[in-house]
Amino acid sequence: AVLAQAMKAAGARGAKLLVLHTAAARVGAMDVGAVTEGGLAAAIEGAEVIYNLGADEVDIAAGPLVIYQGSHGDRGAHRADIILPAAAWTEENGLFVNTEGRPQLALRAGFAPGEAKENWAILRALSAELGATLPWDTLAGLRKAIVTAHPHLGRIDAVAENVWQPLEVRAPAKADFIRAVRDFYLTNPIARASQVMAELSAMAASRAAKPLAAE
């Protein structure tokens, strides 16, 4: 209901509406169809084996076998039965899509430590071991396949115009708004592994807890 009201207001003023998502890469995932109706909970419900691609903000109950592919020893790694160490996003080249749908080219800032591999290389090697070899064996080949399937991802720094699909306007429910993000400093495994971010989080919590005295 709130989104429908916002879309109605934007349309009446000839403005554009930008949705700020709460998870990195969500827009890119929607672009390539890597989404599940009902979210993560629905995706893993009843699963016997879960291949976790660095999803550390989801609770996985006991039962299924969990294979974790990620860069940091965060929540997902602690729940995993098998861990495949991968490069962090700063340690590999890639395409990113920002919240407005703009494809961006990213170059790695450094190499992954130890035996960690680039994410695409892990998936390609695993596909060969499973007898379902993916039809590319280089990053360039993968990128070509992505752009062939989704041409707009090849238009770097360009925003595709989407067809406006207004929602049915309903009266919002009588409920309080809640904060989607509780701690902006610790929203992902890389941030949670950072001493600097931990210090900033503690400082923010301290400021919020202290009452302000009138001058």
Model-derived features: positions:
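Non-catalytic alpha/beta scaffold blocks inside enzyme catalytic domains
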Residues: 1-156, 210-215
